[in-house]
C-alpha cells in the first residue's frame, strides 16, 4: 500500500525539481531594482550585470550610486530614488520608460527597506510606525503601480522582498506590520496581474547580515526610544528591562544572522530567470527551520515561547 504512495511522491518531487530548474533563454532584458546602495540590492545589481542583464539601479544616496557604478559595467545605469517621495517615484518611472523604450520592463525588484525601532509596542508613537510603513509598504506599492504599464508591456515579473517576519510577528515595531502588509499586496497583485502575463514572486529571507540587521543601529534607536519615554512608562518596565532586552537581542542576532547574502540573491535571480518562478522563496536556515514552522503553530504556543525568551516588565501583573 505504501510503496505506490512513496513512488508517487518521489516521481512528483523529481518532476518538480526538473520544472523548477527550467530557465528562460539568456537575455539582456531590463531589470529595475530599488535600494541598491547596499545589501541585497547592491549585490543583486552586480550579479545580474555580470549575467548580461541591463540593470537599472535605484539608489537613495549619490555615494551609493557612484560606488555601484564604479563596480559595474557600462550596461548598468543608476538613478537617485527615494521611494517615500511620490514625485520622485514618478520622475524615475519616466526615466525607466525612456531607457526601456518599446521593449518594456521585464523585472522589478522591490528591495529597499528599513528596520525602524524594534521594541515593545507601548514605547512607540504612530509616527514611528508611519516612517517604517512609508518605506517598507507604501514605497514598494507606489513604485510597482508606477511601473506596471511597462511590466505589462514586457509580460514581466515583480519580485517583492518581504521577510519571515511578514509571516510571524516576533517583535514589536513597524517592521513586522510593514512586511505583513507587503505580503498581502503581493498576493493580491499576483492574482490581479496573472491575466496580463505578469508574474509576482515573494522572497521572505530569514535573518542576514545587512544594514537592516545592524546591531549598533538597532540598539542606538531603541536606547533613544527609551530615553524619550515618560517616567511613568519607564517605571513600568524598569532600567533592567532595557539592558536585558538588548542583551537577548544581541545574542539572538549573533546566533542566527547569516553572512551569505548570495542565498537571497540566488532566489531573486531564480524568480527573474526561471521559466516557472515560485510564488514564495524562503532563503536562510532560520527561515526554513524556525520561523516558517513557527508561523503554523497555535498562537498560544508562539506567545509562550517568545514571552519566555524576552524579559518581563518590572511591574508585570502576570
From Swiss-Prot:
Q: How does it sit in the membrane?
A: Multi-pass membrane protein
Alphabetical list of InterPro entries matching this protein: NAD(P)-bd_dom_sf, SDR_fam
So where does this one cross the membrane? 1-23, 289-309
Protein's UniProt keywords contain Cell membrane? no
Kindly state which reaction or reactions the protein catalyses. Answer: 11-cis-retinol + NAD(+) = 11-cis-retinal + NADH + H(+); 9-cis-retinol + NAD(+) = 9-cis-retinal + NADH + H(+); 13-cis-retinol + NAD(+) = 13-cis-retinal + NADH + H(+); androsterone + NAD(+) = 5alpha-androstan-3,17-dione + NADH + H(+)
Q: Which SUPFAM superfamilies match?
A: NAD(P)-binding Rossmann-fold domains (SSF51735)
Which regions of this chain are Cytoplasmic-facing, per the record's topological domains? 310-318
Q: Which residues are NADP(+)-binding? A: 32-56
Could you tell me which Gene3D superfamilies the record lists for this protein? NAD(P)-binding Rossmann-like Domain
Q: In which tissues is it expressed?
A: Expressed in eye, liver, kidney, brain, intestine, placenta, epididymus and submaxillary gland. In eye, strongly expressed in the retinal pigment epithelium, with lower expression levels detected in the inner segment of the photoreceptor cells and in the outer plexiform layer. In kidney, strong expression detected in the distal tubules and the transitional epithelium in the renal pelvis, with weaker expression detected in the epithelium of the outer stripe of the outer zone of the medulla. In liver, detected in hepatocytes in the centrilobular area.
By sequence similarity, the record places it as follows: Belongs to the short-chain dehydrogenases/reductases (SDR) family.
Subunit annotation: Homodimer.
Domain writeup:
The last 8 amino acids of the C-terminal tail are important for a proper localization as well as for the in vivo enzymatic activity.
Q: What is this protein called?
A: Retinol dehydrogenase 5
Organism equals: Mus musculus
Gene that this polypeptide is encoded by: Rdh5
